[in-house]
Amino acid sequence: RPADFKLQVIIIGSRGVGKTSLMERFTDDTFCEACKSTVGVDFKIKTVELRGKKIRLQIWDTAGQERFNSITSAYYRSAKGIILVYDITKKETFDDLPKWMKMIDKYASEDAELLLVGNKLDCETDREITRQQGEKFAHEITGMRFCEASAKDNFNVDEIFLKLVDDILKKMPLDILRNELSNSILSLQPEPEIPPELPPPRPHVRCC
């Protein structure tokens, strides 16, 4: 049967944190040891069933390099869920989180669900960021969840996406979901302005 709803999720974070690996593990159950850096925006689609509903999930994988920010910023606007990823073995990717929160504050809708993910848990012996540091950062952001994962070992990957989708469904009445998300969302051409039917940009929130 056709999907009941269509949802957009965007994955953001610094270069090399494993955004593409998380997406491909979830959608295709594959893992690439030496994935090429994403140029601009890539996407995959996966259909999931939650709460008795069939949901077509479009996942946008964004480039982490600053030179692509002008391209990727347009995709924040209609995303109902945002996954912010850092590498637990690279402190600089954790230090970049406030920068990414500024992008969220500026471009994302106010009702977007937020999830912070510490990736590469398979490299525990090389850890530079403790779980407590990740939890503390997420705790200081209103409504942000936190978890650690490993795309390589397929640990917590499904849980990341399914929990995010479940949070979106719980937050939005079904009639609103049906009205807002029934239109086709498969075009990857960003609009230069926020469409009038979308929520306003997310107001500034405390990020650190």
Swiss-Prot record:
Positions of short motif Switch 2: 61-78
In-chain residues carrying the UniProt-annotated modification Phosphoserine: 70
Which residue numbers carry lipidation of type S-geranylgeranyl cysteine? 207-208
Question: Gene3D superfamilies under this entry?
Answer: P-loop containing nucleotide triphosphate hydrolases (3.40.50.300)
Q: Where does GTP bind?
A: 16-20, 37-38, 64, 119-120, 122, 150-152
Please state where this protein is localized: Recycling endosome membrane; Lysosome membrane; Golgi apparatus membrane; Cytoplasmic vesicle, Autophagosome
Q: Which GO terms describe its cellular component?
A: autophagosome; endosome; Golgi membrane; lysosomal membrane; lysosome; plasma membrane; recycling endosome membrane; synaptic vesicle
The signal peptide stretch is none
Listed binding positions for Mg(2+) are 20, 38, 61
Q: Which reaction does it catalyse?
A: GTP + H2O = GDP + phosphate + H(+)
Task: Identify the keywords attached in UniProt to this record, alphabetized.
Answer: Autophagy, Cytoplasmic vesicle, Endosome, Golgi apparatus, GTP-binding, Hydrolase, Lipoprotein, Lysosome, Magnesium, Membrane, Metal-binding, Nucleotide-binding, Phosphoprotein, Prenylation, Protein transport, Transport
Names of required cofactors = Mg(2+)
Matching SMART domains: RAB, RAN, RAS, RHO
Q: Which domain of life is it from?
A: Eukaryota
Q: Does the keyword Magnesium apply?
A: yes
Membrane protein topology class? Lipid-anchor
PTM comment: the record says: Phosphorylation of Ser-70 in the switch II region by LRRK2 prevents the association of RAB regulatory proteins, including CHM, CHML and RAB GDP dissociation inhibitors GDI1 and GDI2.
As recorded in UniProt, its EC number(s) are 3.6.5.2
| Membrane in keyword set | yes
Molecular functions per Gene Ontology: GDP binding; GTP binding; GTPase activity
> Know anything about its domains from the record?
Switch 1, switch 2 and the interswitch regions are characteristic of Rab GTPases and mediate the interactions with Rab downstream effectors. The switch regions undergo conformational changes upon nucleotide binding which drives interaction with specific sets of effector proteins, with most effectors only binding to GTP-bound Rab.
Assembly notes: Interacts with RABIF and OPTN. Interacts with LRRK2; interaction facilitates phosphorylation of Ser-70. Interacts with GDI1, GDI2, CHM and CHML; these interactions are disrupted by phosphorylation on Ser-70. Interacts with RILPL1 and RILPL2; these interactions are dependent on phosphorylation of Ser-70.
Q: What does this protein do?
A: The small GTPases Rab are key regulators of intracellular membrane trafficking, from the formation of transport vesicles to their fusion with membranes. Rabs cycle between an inactive GDP-bound form and an active GTP-bound form that is able to recruit to membranes different sets of downstream effectors directly responsible for vesicle formation, movement, tethering and fusion. RAB12 may play a role in protein transport from recycling endosomes to lysosomes regulating, for instance, the degradation of the transferrin receptor. Involved in autophagy.
Family to which the UniProt record says this protein belongs: Belongs to the small GTPase superfamily. Rab family.
> Which protein, by its recorded name, is this?
Ras-related protein Rab-12
Gene source species: Canis lupus familiaris (Dog)
